[in-house]
Amino acid sequence: DYGKNWRAALSIHHSGNDLVENITYEDIRVEESDEAFLCMGYFFVPQYYYDGDTPPLGVVMRNITFKNVTYNGKKKAPSYLYNVMRQTIGGVREGEGTYYDKSNPDYKITMENIVFDNVKYQGTKIDSLDKAKECGFMIEPEVDVKFK
């Protein structure tokens, strides 16, 4: 249900043409979440643009660090890192990956240098993409994510 994915204990939701950069979440402990643990995404909502249908060009989120962040909850709380999420009637659904219009690669929307430094999920240290997936992290392949 993509309608709920954007509600998370820690999240960054971006829609527009500005760059979101140099953000650090540090020394945070989440005891429980009824929704997701982490969520980052770019929301493409056409009415936010003057011409009605032009997404931003280039990197929109970069240099985001999650350092010493822990989820201790007993409930499963997935995490989502989406390059594009589109608003639809009744909620939000995952977009088409990095490119809004795959026939026009100039419309590139990306996340770069997303760092997980000592992030733990229910006791498991997230130090690789495989570990992240095992813990319910849904990360688009185009997202530039690093693990420490």
Model-flagged regions — what are they?
Residues 1-148:
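Extracellular parallel beta-helix/beta-solenoid repeat domains
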